[in-house]
Amino acid sequence: MSTTSHPTFYRRYVTDRHTLPLRARVGFTLAAVAALHLLAFGLLATALAPGAQPLALGVVLAAYAAGMKHSYDWDHISAIDNTTRKFVSEGMNPASVGFAFSLGHSLVVTLAGTMVVAGAQFVSGAFEDGSSANHVLGLIGAGVSGVYLLVLGLYNASISVGLARGRSTAHQHSAVGARGDGAADDGGWGLVSRLLRKPLQRVRRPREIFVLGFLFGLGFDTATTIGLLLLTVSASLAGVPALALLGLPVAFTAAMTLCDTLNGLGMMKLYSNALTQAGTRRRFNATVTVISAVSALFVATITLGGFFHDLLGLEDPATTALAEIDLGQAGLALIAVFALVWLRFWWVGRREPGTASST
């Protein structure tokens, strides 16, 4: 009996977990985020034991704050939002897009921080600004993120065109709600949508975003990476216990996964609701799809401009300007835009007859 129950359990809760009820998948995802927090602050607890270095509390909290700060970078927000939009348009309710992306993204700094704790001094040099390793990894990360966001942005732009044209008749309105956005694509950039579906078909489940997140992370923001590694080295020299030092990358990961998971779940709710109601919510669906597409194309342009500037050693004003743009915390502005759009349509929906009860 044990030989059959184990594969069944593995298939049910690992390979086929996308078939579980949404509430269960959300619960598993949030439980994983909670486990990361328990691990991070469990490691921190070793530094708070009698006679331990009190500096540990400050450095772990600093690492946690760095993880939260980095989760609101525009490329994070845009990648998670546009990927969520893709899955929802395919009839899925993706509960773990943000978690998988941030877990893969933070794995780079987690591995680097762990090697620093283990005494691998070459790691700090590899990430040093201007080093060959830093240059190559930065190009890989920028290339992957730029191309992925470009493809997603064009795909969602094609959906936006389809939605805009689909609003002309009641028949097309019902087709969007019944069959998802894919049916409406053919009314707009049908060829573009079909061409872009091919590469995007490789991303079939939210967990596959983990690999993309890791590749994005290879071009990790230099200041964030160096800052965390220097924090780890400094804390090590100050006598902070090794277990507490390991809490730094784990705390960084815990904070990033928390913020990105909540972002992914929030966008899933927004997009899913937009596809279930007529009138106001369908207009809301079209609006947020346009915002997602524009944000992805905007970030892709900046990222790829900087990529070609560094790869080819270009010195023209255009790519030089793009390479120098620091989006910083612009992701917070994008979240604010989505929130304002939602509030606007929520308010309008409450004022329209027959929509107050469903909003």
Placement of each model-derived feature along the sequence:
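C-terminal regulatory/interaction regions
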Residues: 2-28, 233-243, 259, 263-359
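Small-residue-enriched transmembrane helix starts and helix-helix packing motifs
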Residues: 22-35, 41-72, 94-99, 191-219, ...
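Membrane helix-loop-helix hairpins that form the core translocation module of multi-pass transporters
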Residues: 24-42, 96-184
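Divalent metal-coordination and catalytic microenvironments
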Residues: 37, 73, 105, 150, ...
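Juxtamembrane transmembrane-helix termini in multi-pass membrane transport proteins
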Residues: 43-128, 227-247, 269-274
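Alpha-helical multi-pass membrane helix bundles of inner-membrane/thylakoid proteins
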Residues: 57, 158-216, 276-283, 308-330, ...
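Membrane-water interface of transmembrane alpha-helices
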Residues: 72, 76, 159-170, 258-273
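Hydrophobic alpha-helical membrane-insertion segments
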Residues: 96-112, 251, 255, 287-304
